[in-house]
């Protein structure tokens, strides 16, 4: 995930944007940090999904085919 100081800076810029507004440089920094955050979030979510197996009440593996293929590609 994103470093704590970067998350703090995102929040700081968001507060400033609501109150006083951002300079062009700050707006650019905010956009860059948000892109980094979204990229880190997506990677974490993808990594988590690659560990998921779906089991129905009968005990059968019903993991979607697309996910199984993605897991296979990732781990082999």
From Swiss-Prot:
Keyword Cytoplasm: yes
GO annotations of cellular component type: cytoplasm
Superkingdom in the source lineage: Bacteria
Location(s), subcellular: Cytoplasm
One of the Pfam families matching this protein, by short name: DUF896
Keywords for the protein's UniProt record, in alphabetical order: Cytoplasm
Keyword Ribonucleoprotein: no
Residues covered by region (Disordered): 57-76
Residue ranges with Basic and acidic residues bias: 63-76
InterPro entries recorded: DUF896
Family statement: Belongs to the UPF0291 family.
HAMAP family: UPF0291
PANTHER family associated with the record: UPF0291 PROTEIN CBO2609/CLC_2481, UPF0291 PROTEIN YNZC
Protein name: UPF0291 protein GK1331
């Amino acid at each position: 995930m994103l470093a704590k100081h970067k998350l703090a800076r995102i929040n700081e810029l968001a507060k400033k944007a609501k109150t006083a507004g951002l300079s062009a440089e700050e707006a650019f920094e905010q956009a860059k940090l948000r892109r980094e955050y979204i990229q880190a979030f997506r990677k974490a979510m993808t990594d988590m999904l690659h560990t998921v197996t779906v089991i129905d009440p009968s005990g059968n593996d019903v993991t979607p085919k697309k996910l199984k293929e993605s897991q296979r590609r990732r781990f082999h």
